[in-house]
Amino acid sequence: MKTEKITVNELFSGIGAQISALERLGIPFEIKHTSDIDHNAVLAYASIHCGLTEELINTYAEYPTREEMARQLTEINLGYDFQKNKPYNWYRFVNSKSKELEKYWLANKLSRNLGDISKLEHLDYADFWTYSFPCQSVSVSGKQEGIIKGKTRSGLLYEVQRLLEKADKMLALPKYLMLENVKNLVGKKFKPQFDEWVAWLDELGYNTYWKVLNAKDYGVPQNRERVFVISVRKDIDDGKFEFPQPFDNGVRLKDALEDKVDEKYYLSEDIQNRLIITDKTLTKNVIGTTKPSFRTIGRRDSVYSENSIMGTLVATDYKQPKQILETNRCVKVGDLNYYPYETSNRIYSKEGISPTLTTMQGGNTEPKIAEPIVAVIEPDVKSFRVRKLTPKECYRLMGFTDEQFDRSQAFSSDSQLYKQAGNSIVVDVLYYIFGKLFEVDTETRKEIEC
């Protein structure tokens, strides 16, 4: 095991998935700098990793003037709105009774956030740079404008290139680089640009290894395919790096669900009555129906398991969860004929794998699951309630602990928590990748930590 301290520059840092993985591995590290303009993500990062609390905000004694705090946050483009192409107005808090300026300024200071990467002249040396740039312009769910310098969010990759070129001139190239992005980055449309990037890294002095990995193969019940790119400086590379082998530890969506959920996360009866059973691949054991006055469940309302594997959410016997766990797939049990977007209407079984989490931010776009309830009139019959995943469950599905979630929740709304989770990287996948990169034993941990 390599035990020497690793210094890190965490670009596009989000809520700190990378350092969460390093912490979990027990690797000593020091964050030199982070870089992000999402002010709410910076707030979450500082609360999760840097000890930011309401008490600290109220007792901290070294704040500059409010005018100076507003100037500093504006200068680094914290909170900049790229859709509207306008900076965040920090000056509106100068005469406010609230401590909004103090809160965000202190979060920025504690997380050592440099803000807008395009405004940076250079980065201090660090052994390890992470640079998981925005995916909006290459994602299949986006406009796919591409990686265009100065014009698209994904074009910020070229700011990383500029900073690496500056580091090269300063004889301060990092030993390791890590990039995570959507699978489409290595798809047909964008693979030529990706190959150009890898070739450029080769010329700069790096050997690069990349692979598409799915979170469901690394201990987290979420079907999330992402490309991971590891670059190692040639003068230290022994050529032995390999990506971790996939495994199935049996963890499923139900293992990440909360025991008790606030009623606000359940869909209304009117919407639930629009449920349409659609998974015709299932072959045995009914798992749901929306008919309010049924006495027996008809065949047309039935949902069955695939490939002769028995379904788990069964009307007459709910003690068969492992029978559908074997499918290791995202089990869609039905559709809601209600929302304008097809993916928002999907209903998933909690015995399967979660769909990929996106930035969501509420608005009924959160993944929805079916839960069994016992009918009062006929105790031997079960129906289903449909609800959204909670923010805590989304954090769990990204590999964050409940303690980390609680720290973030202290400063974040539900919509921000959904966004933070969807924007992040699955910690468990990073855990196993970094274990290989830094030669740390990962065999003792094979299950999700909630």
Where are these regions (language model features)?
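Alpha/beta-hydrolase-fold catalytic nucleophile elbow
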Residues: 132, 180, 230
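Class I SAM-dependent DNA methyltransferase catalytic core
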Residues: 215-217, 222-228, 232-450
